[in-house]
Amino acid sequence: MYLGIDIGTSELKALLINTQGEIVASNHATLHVQRPHAHWAEQDPERWWQACGEVIAGLRQQAAQTWSEVRAIGLSGQMHGAVLLDAQGDVLRPCILWNDTRSAPQCEALRVQHPEMMQLSGNMIMPGFTAPKLRWVAENEPEIFRRIDKVLLPKDYLRWRMTGRFVSEPSDAAGTLWLDVAQRDWSDELLAITGLTRAQMPDLVEGSAVSATLQANLASEWGLSASVSVAGGGGDNAASAVGVGAVNPGDAFISLGTSGVIFVVNDRLLADPQSGVHAFCHALPGRWHQMSVMLSAASCLRWLCNLLSVTESQLMDEMAQLSDEQRRHAPVFLPYLSGERTPHNDPDASGSFFNLRHETPRALLGYAVIEGVAFGLADGFAVLGDAKRQIHQCSLTGGGARSTLWAQLIADVLQLPIVTHPASASGALGAARLAWLADGGLESEVCLKPLEQARYQPDAARGSVLQQRLQVFRTLYAQQQQARTLLPD
C-alpha cells in the first residue's frame, strides 16, 4: 500500500493505492487563503499540518484492515510558496503563496540589476516564484529575513514535520529561481543574488527516491511502521503528470484547477525565458518539462458563483442550455483575477467583462468565464514553441475537468483532442506512484496512463467562431494595458 498526499491551495487531498495501482481510499480537508492586502495571498503552514492529521485519521477509518500495510508515502504540493523557519524550527511568518504578486517591484529590480538570472535559471523572473518573495521579505521585513535558517516549499514543510529532515526535489525546487535546472542542483550564484546560501536550502533527492523515513513517534501516532519511507515526491503539476502517465517526451496534459496549466514532457531542458513558459525538472530522473501557467482558471468560475449566490453545478446546467447563437454573442471575459503569468507576466492585469447588456442572463456570464479561461489557455499554448508540435492530444485534470461543456470548449479552442480520466487522476495519485517507485516499483508498471473517461474531438466550425472571439479577447487585453496607464497609482 502506498499513500499520496497533495497540498493544494483550496484543499489537502490524500489517497491510498495498492500494488495493482487501484485507489482503495481517499480523503480531503479544506484550506483557505488569507488576503490581508491587495496582491497578497498567504496560508498558515500549521493549518496544513492540522489538515494532514485530519485526512490521515479519515483514511485510517476507511482502510482500517489494510492501513498498517502502507510501505511508503509520496508528497505533492502547490509550488513556489515560501515557508521560512528560524534556527529553532519555528515558522517566522505566514507562507507567501504562488499566486501572491506583491514582489512585482522586486522582480523588476532583479531583471535590471541581474539580467543573468533568467539565463542561469532558464525562466523569466515572475512574482509567483520564490526568489522574488525573499527579496521582498529582505526589503520589507528585514528582522524576519535575518532570522531565516531554512526556506522550505509547502510539501517539504510537511516532510520536515513527518521525518525531521529538510529535503526537497528538483521538480519543486525548479520553481524557486535558485535551481540550476539543467544540472538539477542548487545554484550558489542564484542564491547569492537574493542574499541566501546553500546552507539555508533543503537537501535534494529525485522525486522517485527515498528522502527519509517517518519519525518513530509520528509513525506510532499514525499507526504505521517506523520503517515507512517518504519519497522525494513532486511539485503539484509534475506529480499530476506522473498520475496521468505523462512521463515520456511529447506527453501532455492540461490542469484546470485554481490555476490553469499546460504541461509538456521533454527529454532535455528547453528554456525560453522571454516567452514566459516555465522550463522545469520533471519529478522523474532525466526528464524535464515546459509549462504555461495562468493564475486564475477554475477559481474564476468559483468567484462568479459566489458573486451570484449560485452553485457551480446549477450555473453549468444553465450554460448547457445556451444555443450556439447565444454563445456567439456572449460577453467576453478576461480571467486575470490574480494578474497573469504566461505569456504576459503581468501582475497588474485584472479581470473584466466586455459587452454586457441589461438582458444578459447569468448563464452567459458563466459561459463567458469558462470561455475566457479557455482563451487564456490558448495564449499559453501559442507560446510553447516547438513543443506544441509534439502534442497530439491532452489529458484534462483538475476540478474543471468534471464539466463536459468546458472540456469540449477547450478542445474547440485549441483544436486538439481532449481526454478526461476518472477523478482520481491527480497530484495525490502521482505522489502515491512516486512512493511506489521509491519502494522499488518499475516505472513501466507504475506510471500507466489511467482509463479514459471521455474523449472530446475538436469541432472545426465552432473553432472558427471561437478564433474570432479569441481575437477580441486579445484586443481587450491590449486595450486594458493602455487604459491602466490612465489609472491613479
Language model segments and positions:
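Active-site core segments that coordinate phosphate-bearing ligands/cofactors
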Residues: 3-4, 104, 109-129, 135-167, ...
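Residue-level signal for inorganic ion chemistry
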Residues: 21, 44, 73, 100, ...
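A structural motif corresponding to the C-terminal end of an alpha-helix
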Residues: 193-200
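N-terminal glycine/serine-rich phosphate-binding loop of ATP-dependent small-molecule kinases
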Residues: 1-93, 119, 147, 219-220, ...
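Structural signal for short hydrophobic segments within the conserved structured cores
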Residues: 25-29, 202, 454
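Short beta-strand-loop/turn "lid" adjacent to the catalytic site in phosphate-handling enzymes
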Residues: 62-98, 124-128, 159-180, 203-206, ...
